[in-house]
Design a protein with these regions (language model features):
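Short active-site oxyanion
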Residues: 40-44, 82-83, 119-122
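Helix-adjacent hinge/juxtasegments
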Residues: 56-79
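Short beta-strand scaffold positions
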Residues: 10, 45-46, 86, 106, ...
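A general alpha-helix detector
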Residues: 14-15, 53-57, 94
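Alpha-helix capping/helix-boundary segments
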Residues: 14, 50, 91, 110-111, ...
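Short, well-structured N-terminal submotif of metal-dependent ribonuclease cores
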Residues: 1-46, 63-71
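Acidic catalytic patch
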Residues: 45-50, 74-100
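Acidic, PIN/NYN-like endoribonuclease modules and their adjacent C-terminal/linker elements
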Residues: 1-7, 112-143
């Protein structure tokens, strides 16, 4: 799909690349994207689910220590440049319907449902193929 200047949600994999220690082209692209938010030229959205997935991936794979990951998440949650969104118990049945209708994983379906409930229809993700729902514009900024 095409890129838009509307509000985009930042997927967990973009966060992982932006904050990993090893230098890479993907890290540079992810960091440059987040810098747009840090320097106030764009606002992005982020969900608690993304932050939880980020912590799980970076600590499990040894990319960051627990304390470093915790400090990053605290900074992200306090940073005003991110619109924070979250799901509630009503979102879960919607996610299950999305899972059935689009043959998506539960976690991607939950994120899609959370986005829809919050009026966010764009996502930056390395896994654009996982968000084939017709209301989502999935863009891979790392490609």
């Amino acid at each position: 799909m095409t890129e838009s200047k509307e509000l985009f949600l930042i997927d967990s994999n973009i966060l992982v690349y932006a904050f990993e220690k090893e230098e890479s082209i993907k890290k540079n692209k992810a960091k440059k994207l987040l810098d747009e938010c840090v320097f106030g030229t764009r606002e992005f959205a982020i969900s608690n689910q993304n932050l939880a997935e980020f912590i799980f991936v970076v600590t499990r794979k040894g990319k960051l220590g627990v304390e470093e990951a915790k400090n990053l998440v605290i900074k992200i949650t306090r940073f005003q440049g991110f619109k924070k969104i979250n799901y509630d118990s009503n979102t879960i049945p919607i996610a299950l319907n999305i899972m059935q209708d689009f043959k998506a994983s539960f976690w991607d379906s939950l994120l899609a449902a959370t986005m829809k409930e919050n009026g966010i229809f764009n996502i930056y993700t390395e896994n654009a193929k996982d968000f084939k729902m017709p209301w989502i514009n999935a863009v891979n900024p790392l490609g």
